[in-house]
Amino acid sequence: MARDYPLDRYRNFGIMAHIDAGKTTCSERILYYTGKSHNIGEVHDGAATMDWMEQEQERGITITSAATTTFWERTEDGETADTPKHRLNIIDTPGHVDFTIEVERSLAVLDGAVCVLDANAGVEPQTETVWRQADRYKVPRIVFVNKMDKIGADFFNCVHMIEDRTGARAVPVAIPIGSENELEGLVDLVTMQEWVYKGDDLGASWVKGEIRDSLKDVCEEWRGKMIEAAVEEDDDAMMEYLEGNEPDVPTLRALLRKGTLALHFVPVLGGSAFKNKGVQPLLNAVIDYLPSPLDVVDYMGFAPGDENEERNIPRRADDDMPFSGLAFKIMNDPFVGSLTFTRIYSGTMNKGDTVLNSTKGKKERIGRMMMMHSNNREEIEEAFAGDIIALAGLKDTTTGDTLCDVKEPVVLETMTFPDPVIEIAVEPKTKNDQEKMSQGLARLAAEDPSFRVETDIESGQTIMKGMGELHLDILVDRLKREFKVEANIGAPQVAYRETIGHEVEHTYTHKKQSGGSGQFAEVKLVISPTEPGEGYSFESKIVGGAVPKEYIPGVEKGIKSVMDSGPLAGFPVIDFKVALVDGKFHDVDSSVLAFEIAARMGMREGMKKAGAKLLEPVMKVEVVTPEEYTGGIIGDLTSRRGQVTGQEPRGNAVAINAFVPLANMFGYINTLRSMSSGRAQFTMQFDHYDPVPANISQEIQEKFA
């Protein structure tokens, strides 16, 4: 079966933004105008099509990136006949910091992105975080300045903020007409026409016309800047322009596309998704400026089992290449069970095929294949390069795994997931729910690699670990709704770590004589701190056989056994290195086990000598507040052992930046609300580990020892 849409008419893109910038509303409108959604869902009614998990609808924030396929016929200048439809695969990504991992996962499979800004707030902290992630994955993007109908909306301020905050060059291609209550439509700077929305058909129709006199000067000025950016992409166009000839509309679009794909600049449009103004021009811009799978450089993978991960196997969007795809999201669907969202990079896949999961080295059979529309699904028989589809019934595949042709194995990606910074104990309210809870938690952990479940060996409690309070709140909530488990949760605990203060040399002798063969081993260890974030390393410097080779793995095993439980309060030990420099052995009484015990005991004693210290996670906090509350908020952050690093004006508010220990941030949202009458908001994310002050360290040791 041939593909319905040629690859140059595919657009795989994500919609990314800060929480509350109106991202889900934008996705909704896109689905409405492209005919995939028959009624408009409003986020503040809790009925948006993309937000299909119940809690997302209740909290009005997007948590999981639902992938949706829809189609758009480019609305051409003056006529719509004969313009081929494009196939849009949209990934809706969350904007809350606790879900940054979701954004990372979706960026790994996108070709382009639409960044949605709030016209009043501009570039907010989470926008910067997501922008940096998109830079890392080299994702071309366009910006939609949304909420132009809001009080205080300022399109040009947002354009300057993009340049100040992200360092990108912002090039407006469409300017809003009016703002706040007087938003009428926009001016397309490429064609120099007004689009004015009239009537109450939810923005489905508009009138195009000449630019009004009051806007001509500002439009000419910004069009000049746009053309200057465009002609820099092509020497001939630049020469023509310097001779006084402007490029025609198709040439201008082609040059703007070239610059966007090369990440030289970012096209910017304005409008209001909620008021249904400016969404069709945004869709046109997606087609004009964002990449198709053919515009993306070859994806370089490596051979399974290659320890150096030498990326020398190319895969590109071509149906004739061997099949390869990346599983980027697992979701539980109440009707179909587990769904694996997969981006196909090369080749084709048919129902019934057997493919290789090259990350795990296991084969999977393709049962049901679906094209997803938010939470409706369409069964398909075949999928092609460039498609984003959902597969049901895969047994061993998790987020970040590569699926590929059995005969042509390749690994596309190794996704790294951050360590959790917060944990809570959880137990079912009734004993009967224990098994249901365990199954539910295992499923949630399969969906979300930044969430971990462990059992505390000493207390037997089940521990949930995640990226923030909201993250764990929502998971506990999902246990209740999807798995019908009522759970009691303990107070949140901080994920402390331990490390050492200075280098020591320590010798430990292990002797045991109790009739028969005894145990003997002596090790001399040098234990040293490393730079923060460098982790652990072990080196044997034994010369002349002071410790026979076969016993050295025992030494390393003994050292590693101490890493999970440090000498101060039993927390994992990080950022240190150990060298085995000398030792003694006995021909009869020495064994691997004896050396393991000697190393373990030597480490415990040596670390205490090395000035073991407790480390705590420190969060980067940003509070955005009306000016009158700044004094109180700064005082409160300082009282939480926070270090305020600066403040700056943000629109008509003030942004306060600080580093605060996570231990002092629990329940902060309630304090902030009461201090600012609900008008301030904050974001925080893990930044680094810092030593805990001595008096507090003592309390923690007494509590956990």
UniProtKB/Swiss-Prot annotation:
One term of GO molecular function: GTPase activity
Subcellular location as annotated: Cytoplasm
Annotated ranges, domain tr-type G: 8-294
Keyword Coiled coil (UniProt): no
One GO cellular component term noted in the UniProt record for this chain: cytoplasm
Family matches, as InterPro entries: EF-G-like_DII, EFG_II, EFG_III, EFG_III/V, EFG_IV, EFG_V, EFG_V-like, G_TR_CS
Record: residues binding GTP: 17-24, 92-96, 146-149
Main location: cytoplasm
Entry keyword set: Cytoplasm, Elongation factor, GTP-binding, Nucleotide-binding, Protein biosynthesis
Entry-linked Pfam families: EF-G_D2, EFG_C, EFG_III, EFG_IV, GTP_EFTU
GO terms (BP aspect): ribosome disassembly
NCBIfam families per the UniProt record, alphabetical: EF-G, PRK12740.1-5, small_GTP
Protein task: Catalyzes the GTP-dependent ribosomal translocation step during translation elongation. During this step, the ribosome changes from the pre-translocational (PRE) to the post-translocational (POST) state as the newly formed A-site-bound peptidyl-tRNA and P-site-bound deacylated tRNA move to the P and E sites, respectively. Catalyzes the coordinated movement of the two tRNA molecules, the mRNA and conformational changes in the ribosome.
Membership in a protein family: Belongs to the TRAFAC class translation factor GTPase superfamily. Classic translation factor GTPase family. EF-G/EF-2 subfamily.
Name under which the protein is recorded: Elongation factor G
Organism: Dinoroseobacter shibae (strain DSM 16493 / NCIMB 14021 / DFL 12)
